[in-house]
């Protein structure tokens, strides 16, 4: 099965299934000398892990990461970093009754046609459980970038019909929704409580921002920074759309409104999301992700079995009514992985480039 590795110089390979014994990752290309321990990775894993509120799946996983290689005496050695997270709360019996059925809007049908065999327990490899390893790997990238003054962080900007205005980064970590507006939290909680009573699910929008990114990252033409970000962010389970900067709002904008004018004091706007011509401009990198509603709901739906016969499906098990609630750390991880990979590529080709034009400050 190909397609399990991302990156050119900083690479992340993941393996493991939702109900397998463990999840693993190999992180290759991390520069040597970075101080690193499991604690550095655990913070983001704790932000993503299930069972932390009544609004997420009640599967209880500690998601405690083990560093198996690539770190000696508290520092990275430049060799591959092996990571492992053990699965401890699988309930595979929840899926035995549907092993020959295709859950609507899941990967069951497509995996079956592609491989001729599939792990039906919790979606197997297609489960969002896999993203735990992305978060662990992304935490390594985030720490390295932080040493260069680059900060990657995200928040929920919409849940279903509820738009969430940005008010403060301080508020994001103070609630289960990663909401930047504390006044919206009661409304979000009430909406999710009603959603559970309706036995339904809903989508969400996540915004992720990288600040302190220097100009010059991105490899035109096919490895443009925005193209790489779209690739990485679209690879996250349930993501159905990615915007950079103003994104689809650009359609209704005029050129006089959309263009980010330059002054000696800095850019006057950031509709481009910090990327011009596929290369970082030095402004904040801004991306938005649209996540679809969870397909695993207890409301009956029509489907077929492996023989092609019609069936009525009710998906059992423990599932997130809104996968977007836990998606913020995943989006941060993927952006950090992309940025570190691009930074190392820029360093490898253009480390000797010197430009007299000053770098504009971020307004």
From Swiss-Prot:
It is an enzyme of class 4 (lyase). GO terms for biological process: amino acid biosynthetic process; aromatic amino acid family biosynthetic process; chorismate biosynthetic process. GO terms for cellular component: cytosol. The keyword NADP applies. Keywords: Amino-acid biosynthesis, Aromatic amino acid biosynthesis, FAD, Flavoprotein, FMN, Lyase, NADP. Reduced FMN (FMNH(2)). Its EC number is 4.2.3.5. SUPFAM superfamilies: Chorismate synthase, AroC. Belongs to the chorismate synthase family. This is Chorismate synthase. It comes from Pseudomonas aeruginosa (strain LESB58). The gene is aroC.
């Amino acid at each position: 099965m190909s397609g399990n590795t991302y990156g050119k110089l900083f690479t992340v390979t993941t393996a493991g299934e939702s109900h397998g014994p463990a999840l693993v990752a190999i992180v290759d290309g991390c520069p040597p000398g970075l101080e690193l321990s499991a604690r550095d990775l655990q913070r983001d894993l704790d932000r993503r892990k299930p069972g932390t509120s009544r609004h997420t799946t009640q599967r209880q996983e500690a998601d405690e990461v083990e560093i198996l290689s690539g770190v000696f005496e508290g520092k990275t050695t430049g060799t591959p970093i092996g990571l492992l997270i053990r699965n401890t709360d699988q309930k595979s019996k929840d899926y035995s009754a549907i092993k020959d059925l295709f859950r609507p809007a899941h990967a069951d049908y497509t995996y079956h046609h592609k491989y001729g065999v599939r792990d039906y327990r919790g979606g197997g490899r297609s489960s969002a459980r896999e993203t735990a390893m992305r978060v662990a790997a992304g935490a390594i990238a985030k720490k390295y970038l932080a040493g260069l003054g680059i900060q990657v962080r995200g928040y929920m900007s919409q849940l279903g019909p509820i738009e969430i205005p940005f008010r403060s980064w301080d508020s994001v970590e103070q609630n289960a929704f990663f909401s930047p507006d504390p006044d919206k939290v009661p409304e979000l909680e009430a909406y999710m409580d009603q959603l559970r009573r309706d036995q339904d699910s809903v989508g969400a929008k996540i915004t992720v921002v990288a600040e302190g990114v220097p100009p010059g990252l991105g490899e035109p033409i096919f490895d443009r920074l925005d193209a790489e970000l779209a690739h990485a962010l679209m690879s996250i389970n349930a993501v159905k759309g990615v915007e950079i900067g103003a994104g689809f709002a650009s359609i209704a904008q005029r050129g006089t409104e959309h263009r980010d004018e330059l002054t000696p004091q800095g850019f006057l706007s950031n509709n481009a999301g910090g990327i011009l011509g596929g290369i970082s401009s030095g402004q904040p990198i801004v991306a938005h992700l649209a996540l679809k509603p969870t397909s695993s709901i207890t409301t009956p739906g029509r489907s077929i079995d492996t023989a092609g016969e019609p069936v009525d499906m009710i998906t059992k098990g423990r599932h997130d009514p809104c996968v977007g609630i836990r998606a913020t750390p995943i989006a941060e991880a993927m952006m950090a992985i992309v940025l570190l990979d691009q930074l190392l590529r820029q360093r490898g080709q253009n480390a000797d480039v010197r430009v007299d034009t000053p770098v504009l400050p971020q307004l």
